[in-house]
Amino acid sequence: MEEFDGEPTVTWIPGVNSQKKQMCFDWGPGEMLVCETSFNKKEKSEMVAGCPFIHIIRKDIDVYSKILRKLFNESHGIFVGLQRIEEELTGKSRKAQLVRVSKNYRSVIRACMEEMHQFAVADKDSAIGRQFSSQVSILSAVELIWNLCEILFIEVAPAGPLLLYLLDWVRLHVCEVDSLSADVLGSENPSKHESFWNLVTTLVLQGRLDEARQMLSKEADSNPTSAGMCRVLGDLMRTMPILSPGNTQTLTELELRWQHWHEECERHLQDGTFASNPHLESLCKVLLGDDAALLEHKELLSNWYHFLVTRLLYSQPTVKPMDLHLYAQSSLDLFLGGESSPEPLDNILMAAFEFDIHQVIKECSIALSNWWFVAHLTDLLDHCKLLQSHNLYFGSNMREFLLLEYASGLFAHHSLWQLGVDYCDHCPELGRVSLELHIERIPLTTEQKALKVLRVCEQRQMTEQVRSICKVLAMKAVRNNRLGSALSWSIRAKDAAFATLVSDRFLRDYCERGCFSDLDLIDNLGPAMMLSDRLTFLGKYREFHRLYGEKCFVDAASLLLSLMTSQIAPRSFWMTLLTDALPLLEQKQVIFSAEQTYELLRCLEDLTSGRPLCGEPDAQQLQDDDIETTKVEILRLALARNLARSIIKEGSLEGS
């Protein structure tokens, strides 16, 4: 069970006084709206103008940084590749792949950090430059933590090689010595440079003994009186036993050799070999791993974990992983000396040295401004089978919780939401539910973006979300009077009610303009026209016009009559249909049979009598309208004449 945290972080909103005014707020998936209200439970509300602002509080502002977006995009590819690592791989092959993935993550962090550093240098005097510098420091700390976790949890380095990894770790993250070396070696007489001994000492503190010996040779060349001492100290550095990667000696052999070497260093110190040169004597004390001597160079060590690794190098080179936390804690205490308290970074590194993965993740979650680091590190550690036993108090596992929190921040961005989809896909327990909740809240600002969102939903058989998104797009299209687009979206949503609404708008538009818009869409409805009766009518009515245009009068007449007698046509459209029948009634050839003409007469009488049919709404009394009355009279006359013609024609056919 995960314990609850203490007090939550307080976010101060400029211009808002929560002591005097009550706050109104509304949560969203990626942000919160906050405003002041005049409501007060104790006092009567005064009609005084309050704060006119609505504040938007975003929890993941880093997604809006252009440089960090590169980090998010590139790490997404690494994350997806990691999920595809075959479970069958075991042992060294699987471990090698996981280490390679970890290094890829770190290279992305470092590339992002270097780019941000360039921006910080370019704008060092501006507020933006200071913001970049702050971000560089954060990324540097992130890479420092990740690298240590890689050594301890992924490489799982044993005693011996462990120290080599830690030395590389310190050298990578304490790199001021390189610029110092360039300054000293670039001078006319390096051994006389004011920073010469600082450089030699720093090289020794980092275990770069070959380079330190080269610097001592320069001192020996320029100062013959100390040449012998430099040669002795150089020999001590050269003969120091270190377990190199290709070395086959055992830890026991290494410890014996190191013990002899250590005794030799101590003998030279006691014999006063370097007594006449304080710099060389101080370096010999460093080689002995003397705490006091190391702390004299506190400024050159710069931080406690550098002190820790140097201390281990010269006093416990075969330190076991299980003992690391003891040396780490004592090194931290000695380095701080009670003068200051540990920083959040110190606590995180200490938790790592204690092999407390969950505490590392928890401390990072509190200290960092976004979920990128903890989400990806936790996922990688989960693939190393290190987190299986840890569930959060609300039932989810830690990996999914952190990945989904990170994904929720991506969904708040106008383009990074597509990355968030993949993170949800790889969370088998709650990923689907989270994706369904977030996908409906993506602002559909353009049709191209809407199609991308729909494609995501359709690929995952998210039927309800597809329907919901299509409804939203259909409504937008109706508001913009784009009826064709609205009809297309309503068909895609399989929304019969909305398809009926849009079909009515098409028919109303036809009555006003006398022609249809979006003919290609209506002509190619196909089986989709069966979605609603009104849509069926729209498609069939358009088919009537097509048949009439192709002079297929008999087929057109049969279709027109079936539209009326089947009661699929809205009652308000009957007069239009009867009016459409007039040209067919006036043809030289008899189109409507006597029976069909009787049906048309019945429909006309039903319409003019105002008698509603089968629950059809909006039956209106058209007798008072002179224009409609004229239409009715013309229709009656045309129907009567057609009836007479059809009876004569049918009688003649029977007689023959």
Curated annotation (Swiss-Prot):
<feature type="modified residue" description="N-acetylmethionine">
    <location>
        <position position="1"/>
    </location>
</feature>
<keyword id="KW-0995">Kinetochore</keyword>
<keyword id="KW-0007">Acetylation</keyword>
<keyword id="KW-0509">mRNA transport</keyword>
<keyword id="KW-0653">Protein transport</keyword>
<keyword id="KW-0472">Membrane</keyword>
<dbReference type="Pfam" id="PF07575">
    <property type="entry name" value="Nucleopor_Nup85"/>
</dbReference>
<keyword id="KW-0811">Translocation</keyword>
<keyword id="KW-0963">Cytoplasm</keyword>
<dbReference type="GO" id="GO:0006606">
    <property type="term" value="P:protein import into nucleus"/>
</dbReference>
<dbReference type="GO" id="GO:0031080">
    <property type="term" value="C:nuclear pore outer ring"/>
</dbReference>
<dbReference type="GO" id="GO:0072006">
    <property type="term" value="P:nephron development"/>
</dbReference>
<keyword id="KW-0906">Nuclear pore complex</keyword>
<dbReference type="GO" id="GO:0005819">
    <property type="term" value="C:spindle"/>
</dbReference>
<protein>
    <recommendedName>
        <fullName>Nuclear pore complex protein Nup85</fullName>
    </recommendedName>
</protein>
<dbReference type="GO" id="GO:0000776">
    <property type="term" value="C:kinetochore"/>
</dbReference>
<keyword id="KW-0206">Cytoskeleton</keyword>
<comment type="similarity">
    <text>Belongs to the nucleoporin Nup85 family.</text>
</comment>
<dbReference type="GO" id="GO:0031965">
    <property type="term" value="C:nuclear membrane"/>
</dbReference>
<keyword id="KW-0539">Nucleus</keyword>
<dbReference type="InterPro" id="IPR011502">
    <property type="entry name" value="Nucleoporin_Nup85"/>
</dbReference>
<dbReference type="GO" id="GO:0045893">
    <property type="term" value="P:positive regulation of DNA-templated transcription"/>
</dbReference>
<keyword id="KW-0158">Chromosome</keyword>
<comment type="function">
    <text>Essential component of the nuclear pore complex (NPC) that seems to be required for NPC assembly and maintenance. As part of the NPC Nup107-160 subcomplex plays a role in RNA export and in tethering NUP96/Nup98 and NUP153 to the nucleus. The Nup107-160 complex seems to be required for spindle assembly during mitosis. NUP85 is required for membrane clustering of CCL2-activated CCR2. Seems to be involved in CCR2-mediated chemotaxis of monocytes and may link activated CCR2 to the phosphatidyl-inositol 3-kinase-Rac-lammellipodium protrusion cascade. Involved in nephrogenesis.</text>
</comment>
<feature type="modified residue" description="N6-acetyllysine">
    <location>
        <position position="92"/>
    </location>
</feature>
<dbReference type="GO" id="GO:0005737">
    <property type="term" value="C:cytoplasm"/>
</dbReference>
<keyword id="KW-0813">Transport</keyword>
<dbReference type="GO" id="GO:0006406">
    <property type="term" value="P:mRNA export from nucleus"/>
</dbReference>
<dbReference type="GO" id="GO:0017056">
    <property type="term" value="F:structural constituent of nuclear pore"/>
</dbReference>
<keyword id="KW-0137">Centromere</keyword>
<comment type="subunit">
    <text>Component of the nuclear pore complex (NPC). Component of the NPC Nup107-160 subcomplex, consisting of at least NUP107, NUP98/Nup96, NUP160, NUP133, NUP85, NUP37, NUP43 and SEC13. Interacts with NUP160, NUP133 and SEC13. Interacts with NUP37, NUP107 and NUP43. Interacts with CCR2.</text>
</comment>
